[in-house]
UniProtKB/Swiss-Prot annotation:
Known function: Probable transcription factor.
Tissue expression summary: Specifically expressed in root.
Lineage, top ranks: Eukaryota, Viridiplantae, Streptophyta, Embryophyta, Tracheophyta
GO BP term (any one): positive regulation of transcription by RNA polymerase II
Cellular localisation: Nucleus
Domain of life of the organism encoding this protein: Eukaryota
Source species: Arabidopsis thaliana
Encoding gene (name): AGL21
Start and end residues of each MADS-box domain: 3-57
Stated name of the protein: Agamous-like MADS-box protein AGL21
GO cellular component: nucleus
Keywords associated with the record: DNA-binding, Nucleus, Transcription, Transcription regulation
Length: 228
């Protein structure tokens, strides 16, 4: 059998009412936390017990949630009333003009202008702001310089490696040229030797042939011819 339907009505017994309140309060706060995390929602929860005790939860801060709530309510009311909407935007424009004027004045003061009306405390505050700005500028400058140094170091290492590779290639080409020169020299030397041997052989054969072709001399002299 399924569970019976719970009747939603005030619990008369104070003890049971307190136990139920504690359980439901914890469950409600847990659900609010889950909603804020899962849905990236800004959640604000305010609970007052029957005894007047406050329980609350806010995903960011309760003040920011309430301020946002009040601003949204005002905007909704003004959207429903055109005249109120015009006044709302006029107030917004006035606030923005004041903020712009304050920023411009602060900028001029940080540039060293319009300092006559400032008190000692205001000047000290301005000096602190300038020092903070200078520290931020120096930190950013050091960061950029460090990055540039790292980039230059990387480029230097790359160039050094390229020079080493080129030097190895030049040495290898030089060695190959030396080997080719040696091979060509040996080939030429062997060619000259073969030609000299061939010429010597030809000369020897020629001398032998010349010697063989000469007439043989008789052991007896040719008799003189008779006088006619």
């Amino acid at each position: 059998m399924g569970r019976g339907k719970i009747v939603i009505q005030r619990i008369d017994d104070s003890t049971s009412r307190q136990v139920t309140f504690s359980k439901r309060r914890k469950g409600l706060i847990k659900k609010a936390k889950e909603l804020a995390i899962l849905c990236d929602a800004e959640v604000g929860l305010i609970i007052f017990s029957s005894t007047g005790k406050l329980y609350d939860f806010a995903s960011s801060s309760m003040k920011s949630v309430i301020d946002r709530y009040n601003k949204s309510k005002i905007e909704q009311q003004q959207l429903l009333n055109p005249a109120s909407e015009v006044k709302f935007w006029q107030r917004e424009a006035a606030v923005l003009r004041q903020e712009l004027h304050a920023l411009q004045e602060n900028h001029r003061q940080m540039m060293g202008e319009q300092l006559n009306g400032l008190s000692v405390n205001e000047l000290n505050s301005l000096e602190n702001q300038i020092e903070i700005s200078l520290r931020g500028i120096r930190m950013r400058k050091e960061q950029l310089l460090t990055q540039e140094i790292q980039e230059l170091s990387q480029k230097r290492n790359l160039i050094h490696q390229e020079n080493l590779d080129l030097s190895r290639k030049v040495q290898r080409i030089h060695q190959e040229n030396v080997e080719l020169y040696k091979k060509a020299y040996m080939a030429n030397t062997n060619g000259f030797t073969h030609r000299e041997v061939a010429v010597a052989d030809d000369e020897s054969h020629t001398q032998i042939r010349l010697q063989l072709s000469q007439p043989e001399h008789s052991d007896y002299d040719t008799p003189p011819r008779a006088n006619e």
